[in-house]
Amino acid sequence: MIWGVLMMGILLPQCSAHPGFFTSIGQMTDLIHNEKDLVTSLKDYIKAEEDKLEQIKKWAEKLDRLTSTATKDPEGFVGHPVNAFKLMKRLNTEWSELENLILKDMSDGFISNLTIQRQYFPNDEDQVGAAKALFRLQDTYNLDTNTISKGNLPGVKHKSFLTAEDCFELGKVAYTEADYYHTELWMEQALMQLEEGEMSTVDKVSVLDYLSYAVYQQGDLDKALLLTKKLLELDPEHQRANGNLVYFEYIMSKEKDANKSASGDQSDQKTTPKKKGIAVDYLPERQKYEMLCRGEGIKMTPRRQKRLFCRYHDGNRNPKFILAPAKQEDEWDKPRIIRFHDIISDAEIEIVKDLAKPRLSRATVHDPETGKLTTAQYRVSKSAWLSGYEDPVVSRINMRIQDLTGLDVSTAEELQVANYGVGGQYEPHFDFARKDEPDAFRELGTGNRIATWLFYMSDVSAGGATVFPEVGASVWPKKGTAVFWYNLFASGEGDYSTRHAACPVLVGNKWVSNKWLHERGQEFRRPCTLSELE
């Protein structure tokens, strides 16, 4: 390929407004049932075609026997009045019936069903979203392409493999997004599987075409040249590869000339020593976030761990919890993160999920510039809002939060239910509005988000932790539990250590619901202090 002269282009159709199946595992399960219905319809069509062919075969066998007998003595055969009548009948009527049978389209029912179902099919946005989710999981959990291709993921119940064609398609998605790092990884995986003898509709020439370009874009000219030569061994007439071979050799020649003319003796130059490992505390946030998602990173000292306790909590002598107090566990000290165990029943969870499912839509975030809600690539999930007036269970859950936190829920936001899709995540963010976002919650008129209550409504096979990169805390999903923390100090100042994230779901289905409690109504429940950081 002559890059800049000959460029490969992959044009995807424009995506129309679409529900975005890839953002919700819950809605993707509906697709499984839809596909099962289509398979049943397809099998019915195949059976109808087989029955039709069986009838035609019987006709052919009968007529073969009849004509074989008739052709031995044609005059004698038609000399029989019955044979003469039946010959007229066959040619005038029965062959027409056979023609109608052959022309009968047995696919009408299947095509009609397929047409109806197709309007609910995923589109290009979903396919690209699912592919990018695989890339995200690959990076976050340090998974190599071969591990993913072989289906060797932790906690999987149903092992699934990727074909060379699948790997090629993933590489093409990365290419379309100008993500040449993942293009290289997945094209190399496709090439490896082809070289191992896997039968595929994809050929090595096509894979090498993309692979050499991805490698070139990342600055590895030597490897790009090597791959181009390998492509030309398979297809010496490949026009783009021949052009690119000349281009690569020209660029390499220019670089060699530039190196020769460079001043100074290369042998006298000192090599720059490699940087030593950086302490975890000083790693950029993205690295800390990914390490915490993998269960690595900062570990709490034994001295701090001794300050964490489990206890029974009665909600400050609340009558509802005196005889059956809530089980409370300290997950972290600063910020203080508390987990409540067995705080929501399976029956309540199912009711909340059933209420939320019909109205799940792509989760939104507050745009700091406009103050309005908008979708974002760093939040991949679907959510729905439930009011306490809709169902007694929702009202009961709201009151339980009030009883256990001591905070007024009348000024809180509605219960938000979220279901995470393939690689579903919510990258590091604050729940509270910062000083440069004065209008974030102005429409609500209830002040800033003072605290967050988060229910875990499912177990997750792998991944899906809630992590706090600033302090190194990781809280893992456990069905029936909830975690609680304050976003603001008692002074009303934001606690920046509460910056947190929802790690990508590696395997499984993650359901959560959260309640954001606001400042209004808490004046006497959580009095303001004079110290800014208390």
Curated annotation (Swiss-Prot):
Enzyme Commission (EC) number: 1.14.11.2
Keyword Oxidoreductase attributed: yes
GO biological process assignments: collagen fibril organization
Binding residues annotated for 2-oxoglutarate, in chain numbering: 510
Keyword Endoplasmic reticulum belongs to the record: yes
Residue ranges constituting the Fe2OG dioxygenase domain according to the UniProt record: 411-519
GO molecular function: identical protein binding; iron ion binding; L-ascorbic acid binding; procollagen-proline 4-dioxygenase activity
Co-factor: note: Binds 1 Fe(2+) ion per subunit.
Keywords: Dioxygenase, Endoplasmic reticulum, Glycoprotein, Iron, Metal-binding, Oxidoreductase, Signal, TPR repeat, Vitamin C
Coiled-coil region list: none
Pfam families recorded: 2OG-FeII_Oxy_3, P4Ha_N, TPR_P4H
InterPro entries xref list: Oxoglu/Fe-dep_dioxygenase_dom (IPR005123), P4HA-like (IPR045054), Pro_4_hyd_alph (IPR006620), Pro_4_hyd_alph_FE2OG_OXY (IPR044862), Pro_4_hyd_alph_N (IPR013547), TPR-like_helical_dom_sf (IPR011990), TPR_rpt (IPR019734)
Glycosylation sites: 113, 259
Entry binding sites for Fe cation: 429, 431, 500
Subcellular locations according to the entry: Endoplasmic reticulum lumen
Cofactor(s) essential for the protein: Fe(2+); L-ascorbate
Lineage top rank: taxon: Eukaryota
Disulfide links within the chain: none
Catalysed reaction equations from the record: L-prolyl-[collagen] + 2-oxoglutarate + O2 = trans-4-hydroxy-L-prolyl-[collagen] + succinate + CO2
One Gene Ontology CC term in the entry: endoplasmic reticulum
Signal peptide positions on this chain: 1-17
Record family assignment: Belongs to the P4HA family.
Protein's job: Catalyzes the post-translational formation of 4-hydroxyproline in -Xaa-Pro-Gly- sequences in collagens and other proteins.
Official protein name in the record: Prolyl 4-hydroxylase subunit alpha-1
Organism ancestry: Eukaryota, Metazoa, Chordata, Craniata, Vertebrata
Gene: P4ha1
